[in-house]
Amino acid sequence: MTISDWRIELIIVPVTDVDRAKTFYVDQLGWNADFDQRVSDTLRFVQVTPPGSACSIAFGEGLTDMVPGTMKGLQIVIPDANAALEHLRGNGIEAQGVDDQPWGRFVTYTDPDGNGWTLQQLVPQNR
C-alpha cells in the first residue's frame, strides 16, 4: 500500500485562559472562529483557523496535559513578511522584526501564554 495525500488537520495548543486565547487568535490575529463548544463540565473545545489554511489549531479545557507556553516552532507560511509584521504590530501583538535568511523571511511572536509562532515567507526555488 502506498501512503499519499496525508494532511495535518488539527494541532492542540495548550493555554491557561481559553477566552483570552480566543480573543488573541480571532480578534487580534484575525483567524476564523470555527467552533466553540462546552462538551461537559470538564471539556471545552475551541477551534480556530488561519485564513486560507487547511490546518486548524484547537485549545480549551480538558484537551491536553501539555503545559501552556511550551509549544515552540509552530510555523505558518505567509505571502509577505513585511505585511504580516505590520498586521501583527497594528493589532497590538509584539513581534520580532523580519529576519531575512537565504531560505526565507521570518517573523516571530508568541501568544499570551508564550507559545511560539514563526511566520515564514518562502523564497522562490530554482528548479
Which residues are covered by each model-predicted region?
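Vicinal oxygen chelate
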Residues: V15-D19, P51-S53, V67-G69, G73-G116, ...
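Core segments of cupin and vicinal oxygen chelate
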Residues: I3-W6, V13-C55, G90
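Short beta->alpha transition motifs characteristic of CBS
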Residues: I11, D34-F35, L119-N126
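Basic/polar N-terminal segments that are highly enriched at the extreme N-terminus
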Residues: M1-S4, N126-R127
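Positions in alpha-helical segments
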Residues: W6-E9, K72
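Short, solvent-exposed aromatic-acidic interface loops
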Residues: L63-T64
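Residue-level "edge-of-site" marker
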Residues: R38-V39, Q101, R127
